[in-house]
Amino acid sequence: MNRRSFAQSVGSAVALSALAGSSTWAQSKSNAAPGRMMAIAAHPGDGLFTMGAVLAQQIQLGGAGALLSLSLGERGAPKDIPVQQYGEMQRTATQKAAHLLGAEAIFLSYPDAEIPFNEESTLQVCDAIRQYKPDVVVTHWSGSWHKDHQNCHLIVRDAVFYAGLETLARSNPAHGVAKMYYAENWEDATNFVVDTYVNIEPIYEKWLQACDFYPMWRGQTGFFRYNDYYSSLAVMRGCLSGVKHAAALMSDPGQRMQRLQSL
């Protein structure tokens, strides 16, 4: 196998131009636009840094996108900014970023570091899914050291189930989510296995501009070099998938089954 073939096949990952059913970098022969995508994150930064690029690409290709943040991530505040003030800065940054990308910003009100996995939180996310009606949901992988990320994963899995349950009466009718993916996040790396690449080159610079609204992206919180990590990660994933910049995802195990007459 030559180097080009290896780079395009490494990891046996599926390369997608958008999360719309195409299995190669080439655009689908169908003229159908990509569907609606909802990125559901524990904190706004997680949503934009790890899910924002695929959300922006979906919108760029004619789909629609929404970013749901379960908390404001206010406890990541630097020492010189009060926690509540930093939370509002996070909200404002998310609204500006979503506007730039053409997405809708939605917020729940759970305190940072205290997002609960219970019926109330699950039904709130279920209601958001039923209201927005996404075809694709992207969220956290379970293999995280962060309690909020772990709970967000569990909440979303159950919320997707509830959203599609016709016998569960809520304010909006049932809605089935066709596909679910998990985003690559430095905090959620345990047992994360890439099987899907999205070419984000068309929106890469716009995504960087959206991320730059966040103080933590600009290095003002001093905790982690988010800008260096995620911008470099997009380059690395692009190298492995044969494009300039890419985002890597893990598909839900329940949608990996193939039914073939032959190989």
Question: At which residue positions do the language-model features occur?
Answer:
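Metal-dependent de-N-acetylase/amidase catalytic core
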Residues: 7-12, 27-36, 40, 116-263
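Residues within the helices of the helix-turn-helix
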Residues: 4
